[in-house]
Swiss-Prot record:
GO terms for cellular component: plasma membrane. It is a multi-pass membrane protein. The chain crosses the membrane at residues 26-46, 71-91, 150-170, 206-226. The lineage of its organism: Bacteria, Pseudomonadati, Pseudomonadota, Gammaproteobacteria, Pseudomonadales. Disulfide bonds: none annotated. This is Sulfate transporter CysZ. Belongs to the CysZ family. High affinity, high specificity proton-dependent sulfate transporter, which mediates sulfate uptake. Provides the sulfur source for the cysteine synthesis pathway. One of its GO terms (molecular function) is high-affinity sulfate:proton symporter activity. It holds the Pfam family EI24. It is found in: Cell inner membrane. One of its GO terms (biological process) is cysteine biosynthetic process. PANTHER family: SULFATE TRANSPORTER CYSZ (PTHR37468:SF1). It comes from Pseudomonas fluorescens (strain ATCC BAA-477 / NRRL B-23932 / Pf-5).
Length: 249
């Protein structure tokens, strides 16, 4: 077994291999399609509204400011690009939460050798929605006060020198929580017990959270890395819990 902090890349690599397998592909493609349709729709709506706003604004400006129409649109495109980049992961995780819990459950079925082609059930998926969304709100409640505290810290001269590394460490820790919580929640482990278990596996958790954090920073690639992280986190759960002695692949 590799050193604890170095096991993260292995889990993510195996998770990616799992979600690309024929038996699990459907559980990945459906939430990806929903997220892509949603974002395309939001971008189209924003572009349409912005176009109406520009058309209404430009006639009221002096003629010598007409060049602004050529400046405003590129700025809008850049703004939308930044918004998509920074909001996609957060919004996609909330939308995909029931799918991710469902995917984690099916990955565990495959990993334990119960069924290489687990069946897809809409009824089973819908039944998971209230629980998984409540858990996402719990994560948000954990994240926000700490993020606000770090933001305030970053505004204090001199002290803010430690804010950047703390932000990075907190982001890595949140990635571990975000994804390992799916299999933990499937096994009805309480929020506090899950956090306590991750602290016991601190270095393994940070290693996994770190590689996921880096992978999700890559535009477009992060779309596939989210389900891969769910599968990798499920492998993390099964192996680190020691319920079964599953060999590394």
């Amino acid at each position: 077994m590799p050193a604890p902090v170095l096991s993260g890349p292995q889990y993510l690599r195996e998770g990616l291999k799992l979600v690309l397998s024929p038996g699990l592909r459907l559980f990945v493609l459906l939430p990806l399609a929903i997220n892509l349709v949603l974002f395309v729709g939001l971008i189209y709506f924003a572009g349409h509204q912005f176009s109406l706003w520009v058309d209404a604004l430009m006639p009221s400006l002096p003629s010598w400011l007409s060049f602004l129409s050529y400046v405003i649109w590129p700025l809008f495109v850049v703004l939308v690009a930044f918004m998509v980049f920074f909001s996609f992961t957060m919004l996609a995780n909330i939308i995909a939460a029931p799918f991710n819990g469902f995917l984690s459950e099916k990955v565990e079925t495959v990993v334990r050798g119960t069924d290489d082609f687990p069946p897809f059930s809409w009824g089973e998926l819908i039944a998971m929605i209230p629980r998984t969304l409540a858990r996402e709100m719990r994560k948000l409640g954990y994240f926000l006060p700490r993020a606000i505290g770090l933001f305030i810290l970053s505004l204090i001269p001199v002290v803010n020198l430690i804010a950047a590394p703390l932000w990075l460490l907190f982001g890595i820790w949140m990635m571990a929580i975000q994804y390992i919580d799916y299999p933990a929640d499937n096994h009805k482990m309480s929020w506090q017990d899950m956090l306590a278990w991750l602290r016991q596996k601190r270095w393994q958790s940070l290693g996994f959270g770190g590689i996921v954090y880096l992978a999700l920073l890559i535009p477009l690639v992060n779309i596939l890395m989210m389900p891969a992280a769910v599968a990798g986190a499920t492998l993390f759960w099964v192996r680190e819990r020691g319920v079964e002695n599953l060999p590394a692949k």
